[in-house]
Each structure stands twice: as C-alpha cells, then as structure tokens.
Amino acid sequence: MKKIAIALTAALFAMACSQAPQIQQQPLENSVVYEMNVRQYTPEGTFAAAQQELPRLQELGIDILWLMPIHPIGVKERKGTLGSYYAIADYKAVNPEFGTMADFENFLAEAHKLGFRVILDCVANHTSPDAKWINECPADWYMRDSLGNTVVNYDWYDIAELNYDKREVWDAMADQMRFWMEKGVDGFRCDMACEVPLEFWQETISALRADYPGMYMLAEGEEPKLHSLSGFNSSYAWELHHMLNAIARGEKNIPELLEYIQKDAERHPADAFRLMFTSNHDENSWAGTEFERMGDAAKLMAVLTFTLPNGQPLI
C-alpha cells in the first residue's frame, strides 16, 4: 500500500510539473484589444484553426480577444450567400461553419491558459427575421408596423428590431448573456449599445457583475452615460477616429487634437477607457483601409491610439 501511495504521489507531481501554469491576465489599463473574424481569420475559418494561432497573438502583445458574432446566421432575407454575423438566429448556439460548442470551449480554455480575456459580440438591438425568438416568443417581443411586419432600420433588411418596452425581452437578453458567462467568457462588446435602453445595460451589467466581478464590457457607442450610468468599462472613441483621419488628410491639426483630448476627459468618468483605433470591421468595409484613408500617416496614427490618455487600443 505504501508503494502504491508513493507511486500515485509521484505521478501526480509529474502531471503538475508537465502542465504549464495559466498566464495572468493583464490589467485593463494595459490591455490591447484584437478584433477576430473567425470565418476569415484562417483559411479553414474555424475555432480549431484559430486556436492554433493564439500563441502568435500572444507574442504580438494582444490581451483581449473580441470575437465578432459566433452565432448561427439567419437565412431569411440574408445578405449575399454568407449573410451578416449581426443577423443572429440563435443566441445560445454557435455557427456550425465555425465548429461545435465543444470546439469553442476548447478555444476559450486555450485562450485563458495563455492569459487572454475573450469577449463576445453581443447584438442586443435586433435578431434575424427568422430567429428562434421570432418563432417561439410572443409577437410583441419585436417592433412592428401597423400591418404586423417587423421593423427594418436603415438598409438592414436582414434584421428584425427587438421591443425593449417588453420586460420579457430584457430578461431573455440578460439570460443569454449569463449563458455565455457561465461558459467562461470574460465579457462582451455590445453592438449599437445606445440603441438599447441604457437602463437595460445598467441593470444587466450590475446583476452579472454580482456573480462575475471581473466582467469586461465594451460599448459600441460614445455616450458618457454608458460609463456613469450603465457600467461599461470601455466605449468607442469615434470622434477621435474621425479626427485622426482628418489630421492625416491635412484638414485638422495638433491643437484641435489636444482640445479634443481635454474635452473628452471632461465628458467621461476618470476610470472610463476609450477604445482607440485606426480601423475596425465597419470602417474597413465602408470607408477603406487605414492606409487608403490615412496614407503614409497610418502608422503614426496607430502609435497615437496606443499612447493617448485613457486609451485602449484596438487592432
């Protein structure tokens, strides 16, 4: 019996030595955010293939991985053959093109082992017009016209807008966020955050942080109340982005940049992080790459996003 105990102890010790310790996550004030499009990040377009690239991203100095929506995409009114990630059919499932839920969980576990935070894109304003909720939930969960048709905003014919006058919508959206927190994600990048009642974010973020105090929240929006009222850690510095474009074109200059920095600091709480970038998936799609917009100044502008006060750089 003594020999067996010694052997078991030795085996456990060997296993412990062979397992690399999990790397500590960086403080938010030192963090760099990386936007990942799973479909296009690798030739395979899968979680498993993206997982193999995590060591390279770690070497680049990335700290927070923001995954563009990973959920199944609606078929009805789909844009093109692939559809938009932001026309979500099922909030609690993964896009089968990317792999299985187990594949995502493996990706998440490996990312955490390497010290990354992983946040998911949370599209709370709308779903696809053939989403699971459309088929299973009351009609008044959605905004509808006088004929009962779901409402379409802008040219987004591939979505249906949710009705936040219904308490049930608040509860269901908070529930799907909790589902992913229970999976182990570290927070969310919230699409069109100001199109959803700020009070929803306030209530939901507060409730989730009671159980997950380290949850990181990034808002696609620039309203200061996203921080002071709703509890977001970070928000988009859109005005800065447009100013950097203008400076690169010679339309604005450094004094105007300094004035912006001062006014932005006055508008936002002292602990608010501002997401700073020269490009993202919206700008790259509609306004051109940073090199097309900024020319030879693109690299200099990228340096500014890493060095300006309260900034959190996005790659």
PLM regions with names:
Residues M1-I4:
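Positively charged n-region of N-terminal signal peptides that target proteins for export
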Residues I6-A11:
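Sec-dependent N-terminal signal peptides
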Residues M15-A16:
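C-terminal motif of bacterial Sec signal peptides marking the signal peptidase cleavage site
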Residues A20-A48, Q52-D63, P69-K183, E203-Y212, ...:
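Substrate-binding/active-site clefts of carbohydrate-active enzymes
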Residues V32-M36, L65-L67, V118-L120, F188, ...:
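Hydrophobic faces of well-ordered beta-strands that scaffold small-molecule active sites
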Residues G99, E168, E195-V196, E292-R293:
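Alpha-helix N-cap and loop-to-helix initiation/capping positions
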Residues D175, D186, D191-R274, L304:
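Active-site-proximal helices and loops of the catalytic beta/alpha 8
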Residues Q262-I315:
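Active-site-proximal substrate-binding groove within the catalytic cores of carbohydrate-active enzymes
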